[in-house]
Amino acid sequence: MTDTAASASQPALVRNELNLVWLDMEMTGLDPDNDRIIEIAVVVTNSTLDIAVEGPVFAIHQSDETLAKMDDWNKSTHGRSGLIDRVRASTVTEADAAAQLQAFLAQYVSPGKSPMCGNSICQDRRFMARWMPEFERFFHYRNLDVSTLKELCRRWQPAIYKGFQKRAMHTALADIHESIDELKYYRQHFLIPAASAPAGESAPAA
């Protein structure tokens, strides 16, 4: 029922309440009341992003009627990636995926501890609250949204902002890894401690 399972060869990740759960979905559109989830993946990292463990990746079955309602961009993007064919062939429901993902995550972090991590993650959370409500409650109510740093960097440090180029694969697992890489980039180039600031710049007074 899973397309991709966690690899036994990956570095061991110790269960810890500071571990971070990264998540991404692909949907048929942007409206959680009328559109549906068609792919979901999770990755768990330690708090410093040094160790990552991939969870299952699920294509969620949806009817041909639902898929036909997608706009041209979604049909083209998800058709080109092969996701539409995977969705048609899948027998996994939202409930199936949610139960298996929650069981996987419980190995690494307790319910209610990890924020939901990703890019524009509030959109994923809206869909999860609509179609996977029990799974949504597994997460802390806070989000760790990399797009917040993206928007600040674009306004405050545009040269640094332009230094990270997204591949825009629009598959759930690839997008998660890209979000983690993007946060690492901002940590190195944008979130610079005062002691490491360029010469001539001083930290503001407390």
Swiss-Prot record:
SMART domains: EXOIII. Gene3D superfamilies: Ribonuclease H-like superfamily/Ribonuclease H. It holds the Pfam family RNase_T. Keywords: Cytoplasm, Exonuclease, Hydrolase, Nuclease. GO terms for biological process: DNA metabolic process. Its EC number is 3.1.15.-. It is found in: Cytoplasm. The active site is at Y141. SUPFAM superfamilies: Ribonuclease H-like. GO terms for molecular function: 3'-5'-RNA exonuclease activity; nucleic acid binding. It is an enzyme of class 3 (hydrolase). It comes from the Bacteria. InterPro entries: Exonuclease_RNaseT/DNA_pol3, Oligoribonuclease, RNaseH-like_sf, RNaseH_sf. Residues 20-183 form the Exonuclease domain. The keyword Glycoprotein does not apply. GO terms for cellular component: cytoplasm. Belongs to the oligoribonuclease family. NCBIfam families: PRK05359.1. 3'-to-5' exoribonuclease specific for small oligoribonucleotides. This is Oligoribonuclease. It comes from Burkholderia ambifaria (strain ATCC BAA-244 / DSM 16087 / CCUG 44356 / LMG 19182 / AMMD).
